[in-house]
């Protein structure tokens, strides 16, 4: 397996982890996403990611999956620079009638901006 992948320990798995991060501090809000964070609860302190992409905001499964892929990839690239916290990225508004390519570009641009701001 490649060392460039996002390992299982870098993701949130339990509902309690998601709840704690969502109740934590809101770090960023953009046109599409809200980023919330809480102190890391895992033993090896590292940045971990959870995604909440609701069907009400992105009706098609292909759209939801594309958004999740783009967000995971953006997080994977910035993971080492981020503080050791549990992050949850939540889609908070309806996705407009964009092509999948335009949606991926918009999601990546916003994710990079949020992670860049958090890493500073």
Swiss-Prot record:
PROSITE patterns: RIBONUCLEASE_P. It catalyses: Endonucleolytic cleavage of RNA, removing 5'-extranucleotides from tRNA precursor. InterPro entries: Ribosomal_Su5_D2-typ_SF, Ribsml_uS5_D2-typ_fold_subgr, RNase_P, RNase_P_CS. GO terms for cellular component: ribonuclease P complex. Signal peptide: none annotated. GO terms for biological process: tRNA 5'-leader removal. Keywords: Endonuclease, Hydrolase, Nuclease, RNA-binding, tRNA processing. One of its GO terms (molecular function) is ribonuclease P activity. It comes from the Bacteria. Its EC number is 3.1.26.5. Consists of a catalytic RNA component (M1 or rnpB) and a protein subunit. Belongs to the RnpA family. RNaseP catalyzes the removal of the 5'-leader sequence from pre-tRNA to produce the mature 5'-terminus. It can also cleave other RNA substrates such as 4.5S RNA. The protein component plays an auxiliary but essential role in vivo by binding to the 5'-leader sequence and broadening the substrate specificity of the ribozyme. This is Ribonuclease P protein component. The gene is rnpA.
């Amino acid at each position: 397996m490649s060392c460039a992948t996002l390992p299982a320990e870098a993701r949130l798995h339990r509902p309690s982890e998601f709840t704690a991060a969502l109740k934590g501090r809101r770090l960023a809000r953009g046109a599409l996403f809200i980023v919330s964070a809480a102190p890391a609860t895992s033993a090896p302190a590292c940045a971990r990611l959870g995604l909440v992409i609701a069907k009400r905001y992105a009706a098609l499964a292909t759209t939801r999956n594309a958004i999740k892929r783009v967000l995971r990839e953006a997080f994977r690239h910035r993971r080492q620079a981020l503080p050791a916290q549990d992050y949850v990225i939540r889609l908070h508004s309806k996705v407009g009638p964009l092509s999948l390519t335009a949606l991926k570009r918009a999601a990546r641009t916003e994710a990079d901006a949020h992670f860049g701001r958090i890493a500073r």
